[in-house]
């Protein structure tokens, strides 16, 4: 048996763009992805702090150091530019495994 646990969390990501007619996904600056240990096409949960919306999508790699956080496709209707997001990924682990340390990136403080 496996359980889902927090793998990575990007806190206080600011929406910089949205493209309603793109196929789908969230575009994230590749440097932020690297800091958070999130890879391209990984499934993530997106939580919008401004309106309480939650959604699941997959990640597209954005230009490095661009600070891009852009929701694409139908997800673009769930946010506005300037909204603050939590972007969360999970992994499956054996429940007997201890000392699982998620990668946390806080864009508000720069940690």
Curated annotation (Swiss-Prot):
Database matches in Gene3D superfamilies: 2.40.40.20
Record-listed Pyruvic acid (Ser) modification sites: 25
Keyword set, alphabetical order: Autocatalytic cleavage, Cytoplasm, Decarboxylase, Lyase, Pantothenate biosynthesis, Pyruvate, Schiff base, Zymogen
GO annotation, cellular component aspect: cytosol
Catalyzed chemical reaction(s): L-aspartate + H(+) = beta-alanine + CO2
One example GO MF annotation: aspartate 1-decarboxylase activity
PTM notes: Is synthesized initially as an inactive proenzyme, which is activated by self-cleavage at a specific serine bond to produce a beta-subunit with a hydroxyl group at its C-terminus and an alpha-subunit with a pyruvoyl group at its N-terminus.
Metabolic or biological pathway, per its Swiss-Prot or TrEMBL entry: Cofactor biosynthesis; (R)-pantothenate biosynthesis; beta-alanine from L-aspartate: step 1/1
Enzyme Commission number: 4.1.1.11
BP GO terms, sorted: alanine biosynthetic process; pantothenate biosynthetic process
Main localization, broad class: cytoplasm
InterPro entries assigned: Asp_de-COase-like_dom_sf, Asp_decarbox
Name used for this protein in its record: Aspartate 1-decarboxylase
Localization, UniProt: Cytoplasm
Role: Catalyzes the pyruvoyl-dependent decarboxylation of aspartate to produce beta-alanine.
